[in-house]
Amino acid sequence: MKIVLANPRGFCAGVDRAISIVERALELYKAPIYVRHEVVHNRFVVEGLKQRGAIFVEELSEVPDDNIVIFSAHGVSQAVRTEAKERALTVFDATCPLVTKVHMEVARASKKSIEVVLIGHAGHPEVEGTMGQYASEAGGMYLVETPEDVEKLIVQDPNNLHYVSQTTLSVDETADVIDELRRVFPKIQGPRKDDICYATQNRQDAVRDMAGQVDVMIVVGSKNSSNSNRLRELSEKLGTTSYLIDCPEELKEEWLTNQAKVGVTAGASAPEELVNQIIEQVKVFGGTTVDELKGREENMFFEVPKELQIKTVS
């Protein structure tokens, strides 16, 4: 049984930056370091940071006074930022710069009282943070997930409307929703460039290229990872039986029985170390050669905050 590796896969620049922020904060300021929400949606990563002294909380009320808190890669609402400022907490912001770009689009629309439609999944922390950028009482912000949601959407002024999207969605599904928005609201405006992040796009393109070449697809990622779920869904949509797993122990031998080729890819928050562990488990179940496909080269890099670039605390 041949193992085919997707390329690109795994960590993106935003995830790399977020994890580095937590690691450097622990190195410079020592444990405990509080992190609001999982810094990235990967159990392997989160457990590793916990062992080094990171404490993950869901609300700032769980952070004691005079402590450091890190905002996760998914971003936070303006209300959370205000609360942290009022409590004089030391904040390091690990929000992905591509999420921040969407936040800025919403904030600009809010200042002009332009209504905003967000394409995204209800309850996802990125969606909650993005919705929390809108402050205009004269306008409004609305969440849609499907073309059917658009059909039911009622806005105040169809001629003064803007849309943005969650960065980790399926490219195809988002395109369907945008098409419906433009049909129902012909004058709606959108971002100059698609909000779907480069890494989400590239990993989905890699799955498209690989799905027809393999008999079964293993996606490495956590169940709460939006972009990992979209990879599994896309592969299934393309006709390849696919599974999302968080660790080698979740891989089942029967999935691979009588299969000639197994594809392996990873969501943007899954580390290569975990991918390698799962490849080794595939080999235990009969995997032989590993063939890595060619893919789009990624050179994106995001700096950590200046305060964390120094080697010692003055």
Curated annotation (Swiss-Prot):
Pfam families: LYTB
Example of a GO biological process term: terpenoid biosynthetic process
Binding site for (2E)-4-hydroxy-3-methylbut-2-enyl diphosphate: H41, H74, H124, T167, S225, S226, N227, S269
Stretches of the chain forming a coiled coil according to its record: none
Pathway the protein acts in: Isoprenoid biosynthesis; dimethylallyl diphosphate biosynthesis; dimethylallyl diphosphate from (2E)-4-hydroxy-3-methylbutenyl diphosphate: step 1/1; Isoprenoid biosynthesis; isopentenyl diphosphate biosynthesis via DXP pathway; isopentenyl diphosphate from 1-deoxy-D-xylulose 5-phosphate: step 6/6
Molecular function GO terms recorded: 4 iron, 4 sulfur cluster binding; 4-hydroxy-3-methylbut-2-enyl diphosphate reductase activity; metal ion binding
Iron is among the record's keywords: yes
Cofactor, free-text remark: Binds 1 [4Fe-4S] cluster per subunit.
Enzyme Commission identifier(s): 1.17.7.4
Transmembrane segments: none
Active-site residues from the entry: E126
Nucleotidyltransferase among keywords: no
Binding site for [4Fe-4S] cluster: C12, C96, C197
Named cofactor requirement(s): [4Fe-4S] cluster
Keywords: 4Fe-4S, Iron, Iron-sulfur, Isoprene biosynthesis, Metal-binding, Oxidoreductase
Catalytic reaction annotation: isopentenyl diphosphate + 2 oxidized [2Fe-2S]-[ferredoxin] + H2O = (2E)-4-hydroxy-3-methylbut-2-enyl diphosphate + 2 reduced [2Fe-2S]-[ferredoxin] + 2 H(+); dimethylallyl diphosphate + 2 oxidized [2Fe-2S]-[ferredoxin] + H2O = (2E)-4-hydroxy-3-methylbut-2-enyl diphosphate + 2 reduced [2Fe-2S]-[ferredoxin] + 2 H(+)
PANTHER family attached to this UniProt entry: 4-HYDROXY-3-METHYLBUT-2-ENYL DIPHOSPHATE REDUCTASE
Function: Catalyzes the conversion of 1-hydroxy-2-methyl-2-(E)-butenyl 4-diphosphate (HMBPP) into a mixture of isopentenyl diphosphate (IPP) and dimethylallyl diphosphate (DMAPP). Acts in the terminal step of the DOXP/MEP pathway for isoprenoid precursor biosynthesis.
Similarity comment text for this entry: Belongs to the IspH family.
UniProt-recorded name of the protein: 4-hydroxy-3-methylbut-2-enyl diphosphate reductase
Species this protein is from: Aliivibrio salmonicida (strain LFI1238) (Vibrio salmonicida (strain LFI1238))
